[in-house]
Amino acid sequence: MDLRIDFASLTSAAGNLQGILDATERSSTLAQGTTLGAGYSGMPELSALGAAHGAVLTGGAGSALTILKNFAQQIDWGRYNLERNHDLFENHELGFAQAFTHGDLGGAVHAIKDLATARPDGGFGNFSFPAPAITPNASLADVIAKLTSTDTGQAAQAGESWNTMSAEAATIAAQLTNTAAQLQATNDGTAVDAACRVITDMAQVATQFSANAAHMAATVTYLATIPAAFTPSLVAMKTATDIIQD
């Protein structure tokens, strides 16, 4: 394969990846800032759902926070290696120019060393989302009190975070795809082809994360509507039963 290197495009691509890294880290901050958790509601079932949703955002393996941190490491790894390849190609070009000038071509030819560090682990992991256990309530009044104690703002805020992360991930995917296309159009060579494959892989991860985040946004937003959806009918039911004489 012929080698064709456009140094400006390598610099531009590395700059793009730095911007994408910054955006990914902002998304991590969104995930980390959620307040949704076990204190979501006085109703045990809703509390359990709040805890599970909170863990999907900020928990361990498979959580949005873990995925975004891993993804940021991948982006930073790609940016670092693009910059190193830029320097490597540039230094070799300078070496050949000096060799022709001084008539010492053999002394200027050095083996190109692989400066790439090991690629960080990335992708998606499994997460746990246990079904809440159903617990009996002493009375309708007890159910109503527990429902009305629910902090629906926590779920609404989590839904907004998921929606924002979904939109940002979609933008990141498009930027990565464009970066790979730009590199492919202006460069030829094994190293550049490998870089384009990695960037395209990262774009696919961002696309999948965007879709997953949109689904989670819809789910957790529905969670916020449960108290308002059921409390009025429960209050009406209690009012009707209260007038029944023993």
Residue ranges and their predicted role:
Residues 1-243:
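N-terminal secretion-targeting helices of virulence/extracellular proteins
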